[in-house]
Amino acid sequence: PRSTHCISSAASDVYKRQIDTAHGHTKKVGDAIKKIKKLRPKKTAICAGNIATEEGAKFLVGLGVDIIKVGIGPGSICTTRLVAGIGVPQLSAILNVKKGIGKSKTRLIADGGIKFSGDIAKALAAGADAVMIGSLFAGTDEAPGKKIKKNGKLYKYFRGMGSIGAMNKGSADRYFQSKQKDTSKYVAEGVEGYIKYKGGVDKIIYNLSLIHI
């Protein structure tokens, strides 16, 4: 699984470490968490995922993670459910994981499936503490990629983490394919494409901020 870390701003001395993989309920993930907990500074927050089941939540909570990422295949350009035949509707996944978390203080992030502002409200109402958004922000000035003009309209390139393009840039380990030396044999679980240019992200954030629960 991919492991990333960062040090927060000077206002806080808490370290963050993330275990990021397409299937977070595995022995490899468990071993990685145990290793980090053994080596980490005392003030280190661990985020792990992704999962979609009550059992997966109990597994990660039992290992002492602070944050769990929820979502197997809900992304707009993710093809895991088609390629691997595995996935759980995002709202059901959030409810499952929330049940598994129980009374522990572990936080829940809904990763994917946010296509409209109402999806944020549903995710939070179901038990998520935060959401991760990709496609809604894709095509904005702040998103990576150059603007391209096609048939008189502006577009921006974007891709899923499981796409061949992303795997060639380092995301293959997230899908357990890092040992595959022949990149032509990568099995994609995401696609690449173009999305209509949307301008500044501030307009989108303003519309999303009007949600009240």
Where does each model-flagged region fall?
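Single conserved hydrophobic/aromatic residue that forms the stacking wall/gate
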Residues: 1-11, 15, 212
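Gly-rich Lys/Arg/Thr-decorated short loops/hinges at beta-loop-alpha junctions or inter-strand turns
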Residues: 13-16, 74-82
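Catalytic beta/alpha-barrel core
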Residues: 16-25, 45-50, 71, 87
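Short, ordered loop/turn segments at secondary-structure junctions
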Residues: 21-24, 51-53, 72-75, 113-114, ...
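Active-site-adjacent beta->alpha loops and helix N-cap segments on the catalytic face
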Residues: 22-40, 54-58, 77-95, 145
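Active-site glycine- and acidic-residue-rich loops that bind
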Residues: 28, 46-57, 112-117
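Short beta-strand/loop segments at the ligand-binding rim of alpha/beta enzyme cores
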Residues: 39-52, 101-111
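Alpha/beta catalytic cores of nucleotide-metabolism and tRNA/nucleoside-modifying enzymes
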Residues: 62-66, 85-110, 114-211
